Amino acid sequence: MAASVEDEFEDAPDVEPLEPTLKNIIEQKSLKWIFVGGKGGVGKTTCSCSLAVQLAAVRESVLIISTDPAHNISDAFDQKFSKVPTKVKGYDNLFAMEIDPSLGVAELPDEFFEEDNMLSMGKKMMQEAMSAFPGIDEAMSYAEVMRLVKGMNFSVVVFDTAPTGHTLRLLNFPTIVERGLGRLMQIKNQISPFISQMCNMLGLGDMNADQLASKLEETLPVIRSVSEQFKDPEQTTFICVCIAEFLSLYETERLIQELAKCRIDTHNIIVNQLVFPDNERPCKMCEARHKIQSKYLDQMEDLYEDFHIVKLPLLPHEVRGADKVNTFSKQLLEPYSPPKK
């Protein structure tokens, strides 16, 4: 006699929840690109800097890039960073840089462009050409950053991303650039006189649309390579950071669905700023907050049972400076336990 559905469920083994840490990320040596993102104000920067610190302990060289115009990694490490990789104080193999992709190619340092006469004007001409295609200027700035980063051969790159909308544009930049360059190729003959005129006005000599197209096409192999790597779970993953509130949970679910559409791997969620009750010093506000957070935590554990869900506490102090980031980072590897009273 066939077993009933109820019997099958009774016989099925309980599914053990995945370890609530980021050890799986630290131990996956094949990872090249790690994105950390989520809604604004949830502690993405603290988490991404902490992850970079832990990676620096086991990887040869680590770069953390902020693509958030707020540039909070300078605040987190209490050290000023710029558009080029700079060594984090106290570390030999951890570097940081900050870019503002919304400024497009104008944001890139001159070091990104070659020195010879034809290409030294690349920055000015790319700004002029890209302005005709909405979105591609930002995408090209990502592309140039990727070209630089790949040339430096960092073991792993951590992205401290801007809030969700910017992040999705970052992940889609290869498609945007290829589409934009395709349109540029189609109209290059029409804009050739404009390009020549601009070069003469800038005192850069003769340059035609074919030369500009050639300059831009040099970036395409890097873009295609990065695009393939982004879609390879062995090389790329995305860590979602949120807090245990409705809007943050909603944004996280939307982000995970968009990542799936982009074929970007994600299997880790950090739930930050959790309040734990203090029996010795009861606080009605804290208890109410804990109750609300517990409700959303339960929902997350049901919804994301195939994710590593890391729980981090709300702290009574700021995490600022390399030492505090280092201390905080240890909680990514060991499940947090509230102090026993």
Swiss-Prot record:
UniProt-annotated location(s): Cytoplasm; Endoplasmic reticulum; Nucleus, Nucleolus
Xref: NCBIfam families: GET3_arsA_TRC40
Gene3D superfamilies: P-loop containing nucleotide triphosphate hydrolases
Function, as annotated: ATPase required for the post-translational delivery of tail-anchored (TA) proteins to the endoplasmic reticulum. Recognizes and selectively binds the transmembrane domain of TA proteins in the cytosol. This complex then targets to the endoplasmic reticulum by membrane-bound receptors GET1/WRB and CAMLG/GET2, where the tail-anchored protein is released for insertion. This process is regulated by ATP binding and hydrolysis. ATP binding drives the homodimer towards the closed dimer state, facilitating recognition of newly synthesized TA membrane proteins.
Gene: get3
Positions bound to ATP: K39, G40, G43, K44, T45, T46, E245, N272, P313, L315
Binding site for Zn(2+): C283, C286
Primary site of residence: cytoplasm
UniProt keywords, alphabetically: ATP-binding, Cytoplasm, Endoplasmic reticulum, Hydrolase, Metal-binding, Nucleotide-binding, Nucleus, Phosphoprotein, Transport, Zinc
Documented effect of changing D68N: No effect on interaction with GET4. Reduces tail-anchored protein delivery
Mutant phenotype after disruption: GET3-deficient embryos have impaired swim bladder inflation and reduced body size. From day 5 post-fertilization, the mutants display abnormal cardiac contractions and decreased blood flow velocity in the dorsal aorta and cardinal vein. Mutant hearts also have irregular shape and thin walls.
Full protein name: ATPase GET3
GO CC annotations on file: GET complex; nucleolus
GO MF, any single term: metal ion binding
Residue numbers carrying Phosphoserine: S4
Catalytic activity: ATP + H2O = ADP + phosphate + H(+)
UniProt-listed GO biological process terms: post-translational protein targeting to endoplasmic reticulum membrane; synapse assembly; tail-anchored membrane protein insertion into ER membrane
